Amino acid sequence: MNIAVIFAGGTGQRMNTKTKPKQFLELHGKPILVYTLEQFQMHNEIDAIILVMLESWIGYSRTLIERYRLSKVAAIVPGGSNGQQSIYHGVKKAAELFPMESVVLIHDGVRPLIDHDTISRNIACVKKNGSAITVSPAIETTVIKNTFRDRKSVV
């Protein structure tokens, strides 16, 4: 079986959201988390989803799962005190519910731009090599104020 563990147990402190955690902020009328879950819901190789959530938002998450017909969500578990603990809770639940030989993909709930091909390639890589990780090139902007710098020293 292929299981997605989606961790969305953060509060969005760095984003400084006042009313709700960032995974519930809406884009075009839909929470970011739903876009992420839909990518795994629509993937034909994903058998089930474990959602790791802030305990106080589990009820609201259930409402979203019903509203958007996210039928592959097999369980919602409370997150831990940090991301690592939240992932542990999700993987532990996957181990309780599914065979040990299952492929488990771990994905951040506020990263909705995952695509079908990336999910498929990760599953294939895990089956072939035992593990996989998705990376993309980092593009960063450098800002230097009130100084002149020789352009040869800025990469």
What kind of region is each of these model predictions?
Residues V34-E101:
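Conserved N-terminal catalytic core of the sugar/cofactor nucleotidyltransferase
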